[in-house]
Structures are given as structure tokens and as C-alpha cells.
């Protein structure tokens, strides 16, 4: 009885020690993430959008850690050629982890070629970007990196583009293949009502949670959690130019409408966390 008691004490002690270590590691990652977000190296126009994009809350929800291998899918966008989230992820992962940028295939269009060139220039000369490993997400998608090697794959506001190109499920599949068992697939996307048809989603630039979860499950993912961090109840999803009416694009037919769309703010977005099962 005495030996059993000693054994239980030892087990409890080791469990507490492990829990304390994991908590300490989490605190270190949280501090490093806050430091990256508050860095003066970030582009001023990007920082102004923090109130809409909620980077600390979003990346914490995805449970990112500074020693992870993370793939960011097609990080550049029209008004964020150097990658809005990349400016946070690159310095955060630079020392102990790895950021892989699965960028555009430059042969697919002149616009994609220019976007990739701008991004690669930043990788070449910027001290925060120079440890980024470049990869490619083509249409149709091919292997992103070595199978079962990444801890996390992240995509921010890209799903509507892949849906329009006809390769959304295929992007999910190559993301699944790249992840280790237990790896996390983090998705942020303009959220369509579930009654939107595929044609509506392609035209308006919003994708439904229902379709996203369905396709992710079809390639093997399990939905672990969802969050309303990036929700915006002011967004009716009924705009003449779709999601592009809203900031930051503000594609308006009449300048007098700008204030109306600025008042709405950036889109209502789903924030979904999937995992690749361990077995």
C-alpha cells in the first residue's frame, strides 16, 4: 500500500511538472507572438487592419507555437503583396521554427508572376523574411512540401479564389498530405450564408462554412473547433460588388458609398480549426 502511494505521488509530480513545462512553453510563445504583432517593422497600412483581422486572437486560437513548421498558403494579395500575416509569422518562427510560403506559380499569369517577384525580393533582403522557405501552390495543386512534415497549414481569405478556379478540394488535399498526423489546418474565410449556391459564392467572394467543412472532411480532416473571432454581424453579404465592396478593397460604383462600406468594416469571416487525425 505504501509503495503504491509513493508511485501515485511520483506520477502526480511528473504530471504537474509536464503541465508546468507546457504552460511555460505556451507563455513564451504568447509573448513572442505579441512581440511580432507589436513590431515596428510591420507595414503601417497592415497594422491599421489589426482591429479587423485580430491576429493575436486568431493565431492563438490555431495554437501556433514558435518551434513549429508552418505553411502559409498563397500569402500575397492585391493590397498585401508582401503578405499581411507573413509579417507576423516570419519573425515569430524565424529562430526556432520554419515558415514555408506556398506562393503563386509565376507561369500562371503576369499578375501572379509580379506578386511572387515582389515577395521574393522581400525574402531576399528583409532580415525578418530571410529564413522563409519558398514553395508553390499551383492550380491544379501539387505537393507543397514533404508529406507528413508540417505542424500547421494556414490560409487567410483565399478559399473563394480556389473555389472559383475549381480546385478548392484539391488545395485541402495537398494541405492534408503536408501535415503530420495531429497537425492543424487553420482557415479564415469570408463567410457566406449556407443557402448560397456555388455560383453565388464564386460571384460574391464568400464561401459557406457548410461547404468548407464538407470538403475538408472529404479529404480526411476532422473539425476540431470554430470561433467567432472574425465575425462581423454588420456584413449582410448582399453588396453590388460582393465582398470587394468592403474595405480594404472598397470597390464602389459611387464615391458617396465609401462611408457606408467603411462603417460596415471588413467582412464577416469564419475561423475554423481542423486537425489531421493521428490514426
Q: Where do the language-model regions lie?
A:
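Conserved alpha-helix/loop element of class I SAM-dependent methyltransferases that forms part
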Residues: 50-69
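Conserved class I S-adenosyl-L-methionine
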Residues: 66-81
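Short glycine-dipeptide loop
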Residues: 67, 95-96, 179-185
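A short glycine-rich, Lys/Arg-flanked "PGG" loop and its adjoining helix->strand segment in the class I
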Residues: 90-93, 168-181
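Conserved beta-strand signature within the Rossmann-like core of class I S-adenosyl-L-methionine
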Residues: 99-102, 182-190
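A short acidic, Gly/Pro-enriched loop at the edge of an enzyme's catalytic core
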Residues: 143-153
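Conserved Class I S-adenosyl-L-methionine
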Residues: 198-226
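Core SAM-dependent methyltransferase catalytic element
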Residues: 236-279
Amino acid at each position: 500500500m505504501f509503495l503504491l502511494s509513493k508511485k501515485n505521488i511520483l506520477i502526480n509530480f511528473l504530471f504537474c511538472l509536464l503541465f508546468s513545462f507546457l504552460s511555460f512553453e505556451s507563455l513564451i510563445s504568447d509573448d513572442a507572438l505579441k512581440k511580432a504583432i507589436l513590431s515596428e517593422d510591420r507595414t503601417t497600412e497592415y497594422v491599421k487592419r489589426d482591429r479587423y483581422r485580430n491576429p493575436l486572437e486568431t493565431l492563438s486560437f490555431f495554437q501556433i507555437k514558435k518551434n513549429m513548421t508552418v505553411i502559409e498558403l498563397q500569402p500575397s494579395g492585391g493590397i498585401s503583396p508582401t503578405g499581411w500575416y507573413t509579417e507576423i509569422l516570419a519573425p515569430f518562427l524565424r529562430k526556432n521554427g520554419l515558415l514555408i510560403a506556398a506562393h503563386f506559380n509565376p507561369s500562371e499569369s503576369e499578375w501572379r508572376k509580379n506578386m511572387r517577384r515582389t515577395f521574393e525580393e522581400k525574402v531576399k533582403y528583409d532580415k525578418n523574411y530571410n529564413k522563409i522557405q519558398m514553395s508553390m501552390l499551383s492550380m491544379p495543386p501539387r505537393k507543397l512540401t514533404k508529406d507528413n512534415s508540417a505542424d500547421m497549414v494556414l490560409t487567410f481569405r483565399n478559399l473563394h479564389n480556389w473555389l472559383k478556379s475549381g480546385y478548392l478540394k484539391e488545395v485541402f488535399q495537398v494541405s492534408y498530405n503536408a501535415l503530420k498526423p495531429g497537425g492543424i489546418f487553420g482557415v479564415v474565410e469570408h463567410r457566406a450564408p449556407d443557402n448560397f449556391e456555388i455560383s453565388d459564392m464564386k460571384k460574391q467572394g464568400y464561401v459557406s462554412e457548410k461547404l468548407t467543412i464538407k470538403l475538408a472532411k472529404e479529404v480526411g480532416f476532422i473539425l476540431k473547433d470554430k470561433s467567432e473571432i472574425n465575425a462581423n454581424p454588420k456584413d449582410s453579404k448582399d453588396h453590388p460588388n460582393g465582398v470587394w465592396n468592403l474595405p480594404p478593397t472598397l470597390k464602389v460604383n459611387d464615391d458617396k458609398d465609401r462611408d457606408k462600406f467603411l462603417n460596415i468594416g471588413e467582412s464577416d469571416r469564419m475561423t475554423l480549426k481542423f486537425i489531421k487525425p493521428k490514426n
